[in-house]
Amino acid sequence: MKQTAAVLLARRPGRTFVADDVTVGTVDLPALTPGHALVRNQYMSLDPSTRGRMDPGEKQYTTNFEVGGPLDGSAIGVVVESAADSLPVGATVRHRLGWREYAVIDEAVVTVCDLDTAPATAWLSSLGQTGFTAYAGLLPVGQLAAGETVLVSGAGGAVGSMAGQFARLLGAGRVVGSAGGAQKCAWLVEDCGFDHAINYRDSDFATELPKAAPGDIDLFFDNVGGWQFASALHSMKIHGRVSMCGAVSNFGTQDQPSTAVLIEAVLRRLTIRGFIVRDFEDLRPQFERQVGGWLATGALVDRATIVEGIENAGAGLAGLLSGANLGKALVKLSD
């Protein structure tokens, strides 16, 4: 049986993930059967949700990784051998068997990517699950309306940078982001069109937010949770909305705020809604048309931080979780 190099979970991480929590090993490649194709992966996505799946607790929307078993996630690759009519050799495809150099994929759960619409990396970022998450969190979840003030936490990362740009392109009146570091904040304002960016590492977020959004916030797109979430509730408008996309602060060492802050949700009559993007698949064609159009006209900045080689995937994930990336975090596996 053929095998491929793959990233395996070496142990359950502590509160802070380190690169040695994973290791590179091999996994078997199943035989090619009708409806399947062998893909050489070119790029794979690094996502905060990967860290959550390393814990043993049950998740309601996906499966958790087993110690000694391979990781998986979104990837882009080229078909090198095929027993599927819809997947000719040479086609570029997006699928869910990343974290390995080769994969046998089922044509029923694969997206064939049009490289005339966007480059391969964009199909993992602005046109991938990253962009789709931002789009869903703003529209069906967040109910964004023209002229509103939007706050995005974790705005220097993949989903956050897309959420802020999408909000601007969809007609938001003011877009404020939070990010860790002066470089990220400058990029958000100068390149991505944010009106203001708060450097939470060098300033007090709770003090700076009312200055950045003096009329208070209509919609808060939260990727971070923790103290930023708690502080933002004090700057929400009456009947404001919160789209809860993630809580990456849970994976760090910082103490978490008391749930007593949720009284602000009562006093301000807030709508706080968590979401999983796969619940909105019926929206994907609209999303791809609209975002593809923005890419074609140059209205959208799609930046990636790329780590080279499967052996560096663990370090890349550790960097992502510590906020080292600017925009989308990817691993390049092959040309």
List each model region and its residues.
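Glycine-rich phosphate-binding loop and adjacent beta-alpha segment
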Residues: 189, 227-300, 334-335
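Glycine-rich beta-strand-centered segment in the early N-terminal region that forms part
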Residues: 29-46, 56-99
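Short glycine/proline-centered loop/turn elements that form peptide/ligand docking sites
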Residues: 82-86, 177-187, 201, 205, ...
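N-terminal Rossmann-like NAD(P) cofactor-binding module of classical short-chain dehydrogenase/reductase
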Residues: 94, 151, 198, 220-221
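Short amphipathic alpha-helix with an adjacent loop that forms part of the alpha/beta core around
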Residues: 204-215
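Mid-domain Rossmann-like dinucleotide-binding core that forms the NAD(H)/NADP(H) cofactor-binding site
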Residues: 123-202
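NAD(P)H dinucleotide-binding glycine-rich loop of Rossmann-like/cofactor-binding domains
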Residues: 71-78, 88-154
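C-terminal hydrophobic helical "lid"/dimerization subdomain
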Residues: 1-2, 278-335
